[in-house]
Every structure is written in structure tokens, then in C-alpha cells.
């Protein structure tokens, strides 16, 4: 879960305040000391932490808070607002005013630049754009091949001229190619280095002068913490960045980069990415991220993920089947696939208000559990999936052997499935009687 350590500490500290009827200056001082320590441990820039704590404390000591009937909730509201301000207040969108829109991707080696280029292409393609990926890393062995593989995985063309032509000339030729072939977005994957150096910056500056990109996005590894902010400062000084993409937010990222970059460089975070799957990228919303960190959920992002993963026609069919109790294991398997497309279950549950990382630790969210359920269903015959009532003890034994599980695990899944089907039928009938629009669930559990 994103920023798990920081999130736990902030939530624990602020929960102490909500348990008190009245707050004193001493209470707020103690809480702010803990908040300060939590932010520093998350590798947030020291000056940023100092200003943040000062701003929260000044507002928290105001008359409106101290005399409020719910002062603890008021302080949480202030922390939420200040966290949002720290990360940029509002989302900053990609500038598509120029045709074609040129996005120059830059960053150090290992940050995930090539994969991120593919993820952005994939996202823009889903938004109705016609992106072109451009291979300008002519130095790293197999870099061009890697981009071609990425492009193929997201069904996006890759422009390449091999590794003997200069990146500047490749960029110019790619722009002409895009104009002739109707590509409205050109994503230039430039070369990275192990560290910031003059040659890297000079090459990027030359590409910038020649093709005049609408966006210069710096890809940063969130796990590098404060170093990421230093890298952002160096690149911004030479190139005037328009945005940052933070990657590897599913790792042990402590959150320092996300909470420091905007405040230190004034460069907005435009996307955040996690994992290797091409769908694992989302537009960065400072207000939603602040809410996630404080355990207040992110319902809007959850809805957006569900809408992008769910087939509308299938959702209508599913709703009818659930109401009539004709929902089968075939449908269940289909819903599992759609849910997997929404991203890791732990991340999805983390977007629900009130579900914090401590609560998630008590739940088995292993991908292996999904795989086990999938294996059991796939080991059934088509007839068994449609009519689970016919699955007797000998069939259960065969299914267990075919899926590498035990008969008791097969029994458990069938029982849970039948219980769920009954419950969903009752839910569907109840909502129909109430005459309200039924909730279209993206998955059946």
C-alpha cells in the first residue's frame, strides 16, 4: 500500500486527538512533534516538514478549532488540506493544445522511463489518442528492442532509426512521421544515465530546441526518496520540466518524494505508477492522495478504475443474473478477470474510507489466493460451472486434483459461491422493491 508507514503513523497520531473532547495547546504541540517525526522518517525534505508543521500548528491553535465541539476532526481537516497544498492542490493535466502533442520523457537509468512511456501511451490510447513511441536511447544495449516490446504490448507503433543516428535527428524524423501518419501524440523515450551529467543534459537540451515539446516529463523512482528531489532540481534547472511521473509506488516507498517535489521545485506530479502491468498508472490528484494517506479513502479513483475495467453490457447482464440467481461460476470467473484488471486488491481496498493498512494486514490479499480460486473454477467442466449443484463428492475430488488443491478447499469455494448467490438475489429483489437504481457492482464480492 502506498506510503504505508507514514499513513499508519499519521493516523495513529491524529486518532489520539479525536478521542478528546477539548484540545489544549499542549495536546497540539505533542501531536505536531509526532507528525514532524513521521514526515522526516518518510524522507520528506526538512524545510518542507518545518513549513508544513508550522502551517498546521498555526491553524490548529485558532479559536475555531480550540472552541469546536469536535476539535480533533477539525485538526484532521487542516492536516488533510495542508497535505493537499503540499502536493499541489489540483491535478495538472497534459497540455494537448499543440498538434501533434510532443511529450519528452527523461530521467536516470532504472527509474522505469521506457515502461512508463508505454504506460502513458496505453492510457492516452484509451482516451482516444493515437500515440507514437519514439526510440531515442541509442546507447543502452537492447533499449530500442525493449521499447518495441513495450509498444507491441500496448498496441502502439514505435518509431526507430537504429542506434547509429543521433537522438536529435531521430526526434525530428519522428515528428514528420507522426504528421504523415496521423499520430496526435509523440512520446520520445530519451536515454538515461547512471547520474546527472553534462552530456545527458546537453543532448536533452538539443532535442528540446529542435522539436519544442509541449511536455517534458521527468520519471523518478519514488523509492529513492530525497535523492529524487535533488534529481528533479537538476533536471528542472536545465530543461524547465512541466511535470514529474513517480514510479515504483508499490515498493517500500516512504513518500518523501511525493510530498517534497512540488514544494521544493514547483514542478507538478502528473502521474503515479506502480507495478509492471501497463494499466498500472494513474493521473495524480493531490487531494485524493492526501485522503489516502490519512485513511480517508479515495472513492473517486476507485469508481474510475471500476468504470475503465467493466464492460457496460456485461455489467447489465450480470445485474440481471444476480437478481434472478442465475449467476454461474463462468460469470464469477469473468468478474475475477475484470477485478484483476483494476489493479492489486490491497490498493483497491486502501481506497475505501476507513480501511487503513492495519486493517488490511488481517486479510489474506495474496495473488496466490486469486490464482487458487481461478484454478478450481478452470478445473470444472463447463456444465459444472453452469450448474454447480451437480458437483458431488467424486467430482469435487477430481476438481481438487486438477487444480492442485484439496477437496475441502473446493467445498469451501462452492459453499461461499452459493451463499453469495443467495445474498445477491435478496439484495437485487430488495432494491427493486424500493424502486431505486440498482448498484452495478464491478465484481461479485
Where do the PLM segments sit?
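Primarily NTPase-proximal linker/entry elements flanking Walker-type ATP/GTP-binding cores
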Residues: 6, 10-136, 143-163, 167-190
